[in-house]
From Swiss-Prot:
Species of the source: Debaryomyces hansenii (strain ATCC 36239 / CBS 767 / BCRC 21394 / JCM 1990 / NBRC 0083 / IGC 2968)
Location in or out of the cell: Nucleus; Chromosome, Centromere, Kinetochore
Name of the protein in question: Probable kinetochore protein NDC80
PANTHER family: KINETOCHORE PROTEIN NDC80 (PTHR10643), KINETOCHORE PROTEIN NDC80 HOMOLOG (PTHR10643:SF2)
A GO cellular component entry from the record: Ndc80 complex
GO MF annotations, alphabetized: microtubule binding
Assembly and binders: Component of the NDC80 complex, which consists of NDC80, NUF2, SPC24 and SPC25.
Keyword Nucleus included in the entry's annotation: yes
Pfam family, one: Ndc80_HEC
Length: 650
C-alpha cells in the first residue's frame, strides 16, 4: 500500500500514532520496558521481553500505574537512550560500549545537511509567515498561550514571542511535555530528538537571540514544525493513510488497532476481533467475486458486439477502398482526355512548320549541288582528278603519323634516361648512408675494444665522381679500400671478439655455480623457517582455544554479574530517588559532550573532503601527463617506423 506523506524530511515516529487513553502509559510501565530492553541488550534471549515481563517484582512497578505518562520523551526507547550511563543502571558491558560508540560515530560523521530553502528571500518569508500565522490562528494560539499574536509578530519577534510559539508548536506534537530547563537547552535537545534536518545551521548562542540576522533560520524551523504538526494530524486520519480502493487494508488495520487496544487493556483474547475481520473479509471477497462475474459477463457481451461491428467495419473499409480506386481512375481519364484535346489544336501548327522546313532544305540542297559543280570545274582546269587529291591526303597523313611516332619514342627515351639518372642518384645516396652506418658501427665497436689497431673506416674517393664521369665505374674506383682485404680484417677482428665472448661465458658459468650454491642454502633456511612457522601456528591454535574458553568463562561471569547488578538496580530505583538530580546534570554534560564531539567530527569530515579533492586533482594532473607522454612515444615510434621502411625499400 503506497502512502503519500506531505513532507519527506519530517520524522514519522511510531510513538506519535498512539491513542491517549490513559492506560499503561505511566512512568512505571516505561521503566519496566526499559529494564526489559536492557535485559535484551545484555545478551539474554529475546523471548523474555514479551508478555513474560511480569516476572519483575510487582512492588517495583506499583508506583503511578493509574497516572498518564509525562511526555512522548518518556517512551521506553527514549528512556533507554537518555539513561545509558545513569547511576540507576549497571555498568555497560564491552559489547554495549562498542555498539554505542559505533552509533555515536555514525551520528557524528553524518555529512553537513545544508538548508536549500531560500530563507533570505522576502517573498518566501512572507509565504511561510502567512502559513504559520494561519496555523496558529486555526489552533487558538492566543487562547491557549494567553499571548497576543499579530502578523508583525512573525516579522519582528521578541525572544518571548519565539519561546511561546515554539512551546505551543511542540506541545501540539507532544501535549504532555513540560518545559523545565533553559530555552537554549530545550530547543536544541528537542530539535535533535525530532531529527530536524537543518540543525547544523543553529547553535545555542543564536537561540538566546533569535532576532535580527538569525531570524530567517528560526522562521524556517518554525515553518518545519508547522508542517510536522500537519503531518501528525494527517497520520491520525485514516483516510490519508489508506487508499479508498483498498478495503482489505482497512479491515486488517481495524483488526490490528482493536487488538492493540485490547493488549493495552491487558486482554489476551483477540478471537472476537479475528472473527469479525474474517467475516468482513469473506463478505468483501464474495462481493468482489460477484463483481468479477458481472464484469466478465458484460465483457463477453461487449466482445460479441465488438466482433459484429468489426465485421461490418471490414465491409465498409473494402467498399471505401474500391470507391477511392474508381475515383482515381476517373481523375486519370479526365486528365488524359484534356491532354489529347489540347494536342489537337497544336497539330496544324506543327504540320505547317514541318512543310516550311522541308522547302528550306530543298533550296539549300540545290545551292550546295551548284557549288559542288563549280569546284569540280576548277579542279579539272588545273589537271587534277579527285583520286590524285585523295592520294596526296593519304601520304600527308602517313608522314604526320611517322613524325608523331618518332617524337613519342624520343620522349620515352628522355624519360628512361631521367629515371636511370634518378635511380643512380638514389643508389649513390643509399650507398653513402650505408657507409655512414658502417663507419658509426665500426667506431662504436672499436671504442669497446682497443686491442686491434686497424682503421676500418671506408669513404668515397671523390664525392663528385658521378657528375663528372658518365662512364661505368668499378667498386674499387668508388671507395678508398679493397672490399676483399676489408672482409679479411673484419673476420680476424670477429675471431678476437669471439674469444673474448667465450672467456666471459666461462666466468658467467662459474658465477652461476656460486649462485646455485647460495640458492640451495637459502632453500634450506626457508625449509627451517617453514617448520618453525608450522610450530608457531600450532601454538597459536592452542592459544586461541585457551583464549576462547577464557572469554566464554568471562562472558558467563559477566552475565551473572549483570544479572546481580540489574537486581541491585531495581532495588535502588525504589529506594534512591535522590540520584535523579545527579542524572539530569549528567545528561546535560553528556549532551554538551555530544555537541563538541559532533563539531570535531564535522570539522574532520570537511578536512577529509578537502584532502580528497587535492588528491583527485593531483591524480588528474598525473594522468594527463602520462597520456601526453604516451602520445609523444607513439608519435616517435611512428616516425621511426616510417624511416625504417624507407631504408628497407632503398
Amino acid at each position: 500500500m503506497n502512502v503519500d506523506y506531505p513532507m519527506n524530511n519530517i520524522p514519522q515516529a511510531s510513538s506519535l500514532l498512539r491513542k491517549n487513553n490513559g492506560k499503561r502509559l505511566s512512568m512505571a510501565s516505561a521503566a519496566r520496558t526499559s529494564l526489559l530492553g536492557n535485559l535484551n541488550l545484555n545478551g539474554t534471549s529475546g523471548g523474555a521481553s514479551g508478555r513474560n515481563s511480569n516476572i519483575i517484582d510487582s512492588s517495583s512497578l506499583s508506583m503511578g500505574n493509574t497516572g498518564k505518562r509525562r511526555s512522548l520523551l518518556s517512551t521506553p526507547a527514549s528512556i533507554n537512550r537518555r539513561r545509558q550511563s545513569s547511576l540507576l543502571q549497571a555498568p555497560m558491558s564491552s559489547s554495549q560500549m562498542s555498539s554505542q560508540s559505533q552509533q555515536a560515530s555514525q551520528q557524528t560523521q553524518a555529512p553537513f545537511n545544508q538548508d536549500q530553502r531560500p530563507l533570505r528571500d522576502k517573498n518566501y518569508q512572507t509565504l511561510i509567515q502567512q502559513e504559520i500565522y494561519d496555523f496558529l490562528l486555526a489552533n487558538k494560539f492566543e487562547l491557549e498561550m494567553n499571548h497576543p499574536l499579530t502578523f508583525k509578530t512573525l516579522k519582528q519577534p521578541t525572544q518571548k514571542d519565539f519561546v511561546v510559539i515554539f512551546q505551543f508548536l511542540y506541545n501540539k506534537i507532544d501535549p504532555y511535555y513540560r518545559f523545565t530547563k533553559s530555552i537554549e537547552t530545550e530547543v536544541f535537545l528537542l530539535l535533535k530528538i525530532l531529527n530536524y534536518p537543518y540543525l547544523d545551521g543553529i547553535n545555542r548562542s543564536q537561540i538566546s537571540a533569535v532576532g535580527g540576522q538569525n531570524w530567517p533560520n528560526f522562521l524556517g524551523m518554525l515553518y518545519w514544525l508547522v508542517k510536522l504538526n500537519l503531518s501528525v494530524l494527517n497520520l491520525n486520519s485514516k483516510v490519508d493513510l489508506i487508499s479508498p480502493d483498498d478495503e482489505f487494508d482497512k479491515i486488517f488495520i481495524n483488526y490490528i488497532t482493536q487488538s492493540y487496544r485490547a493488549f493495552i487493556d491487558e486482554r489476551d483474547d483477540y478471537s472476537e476481533y479475528y472473527d469479525e475481520m474474517k467475516s468482513r473479509f469473506d463478505e468483501l471477497n464474495n462481493n468482489i467475486i460477484q463483481d468479477i462475474e458481472n464484469i466478465s459477463n458484460e465483457n463477453n457481451e461487449l466482445l460479441n458486439q465488438y466482433n459484429e461491428l468489426n465485421g461490418q467495419l471490414d465491409i465498409l473499409e473494402n467498399s471505401e477502398k474500391k470507391s477511392k480506386a474508381l475515383e482515381n481512375d476517373l481523375i486519370k481519364f479526365k486528365a488524359y482526355i484534356e491532354t489529347m484535346e489540347s494536342r489537337k489544336s497544336k497539330w496544324s501548327e506543327i504540320l505547317n512548320k514541318i512543310t516550311q522546313e522541308i522547302g528550306n532544305c530543298e533550296v539549300e540542297l540545290n545551292n550546295i549541288e551548284s557549288v559542288k559543280r563549280d569546284y569540280e570545274a576548277q579542279i579539272g582546269q588545273q589537271g587534277l582528278t579527285p583520286n590524285d587529291i585523295d592520294n596526296l591526303n593519304t601520304e600527308r597523313d602517313k608522314l604526320s603519323k611517322s613524325i608523331d611516332l618518332i617524337s613519342n619514342s624520343l620522349e620515352d627515351l628522355k624519360d628512361v634516361y631521367h629515371n636511370k639518372q634518378i635511380n643512380l642518384q638514389k643508389n649513390y645516396q643509399s650507398l653513402e648512408n650505408f657507409l655512414k652506418q658502417y663507419n658509426n658501427l665500426i667506431y662504436k665497436i672499436q671504442l669497446k675494444n682497443h686491442n686491434y689497431d686497424y682503421n676500418f673506416e671506408i669513404n668515397f674517393r671523390n664525392n663528385t665522381i658521378i657528375n663528372e664521369t658518365p662512364d661505368l665505374l668499378k667498386p674499387n674506383e668508388i671507395i678508398n679500400k679493397n672490399l676483399k682485404d676489408e672482409k679479411i680484417q673484419l673476420l680476424n677482428y670477429k675471431s678476437i671478439i669471439n674469444t673474448n665472448v667465450h672467456m666471459h661465458q666461462d666466468e658467467q658459468i662459474k658465477l652461476q655455480e656460486q649462485i646455485d650454491l647460495i640458492s640451495e642454502l637459502i632453500m634450506e633456511r626457508r625449509e627451517e623457517i617453514e617448520t618453525l612457522e608450522a610450530k608457531l601456528t600450532a601454538n597459536k591454535s592452542t592459544y586461541d582455544e585457551i583464549y576462547e574458553t577464557m572469554i566464554n568463562d568471562t562472558t558467563t561471569y559477566s552475565m551473572q554479574i549483570e544479572k546481580l547488578e540489574r537486581e541491585l538496580r531495581s532495588i535502588k530505583i525504589n529506594t534512591n530517588q535522590g540520584f535523579i538530580e545527579v542524572e539530569n546534570k549528567f545528561q546535560n554534560i553528556q549532551i554538551e559532550y555530544d555537541e563538541l564531539l559532533y563539531e570535531i567530527h564535522s570539522n574532520r569530515s570537511i578536512l577529509h573532503d578537502k584532502i580528497q579533492k587535492i588528491i583527485e586533482s593531483t591524480i588528474g594532473f598525473k594522468i594527463n601527463i602520462q597520456s601526453n607522454l604516451e602520445d609523444l612515444e607513439n608519435l616517435a615510434f611512428d616516425e621511426f617506423e616510417k624511416e625504417d621502411k624507407k631504408l628497407n625499400k632503398n
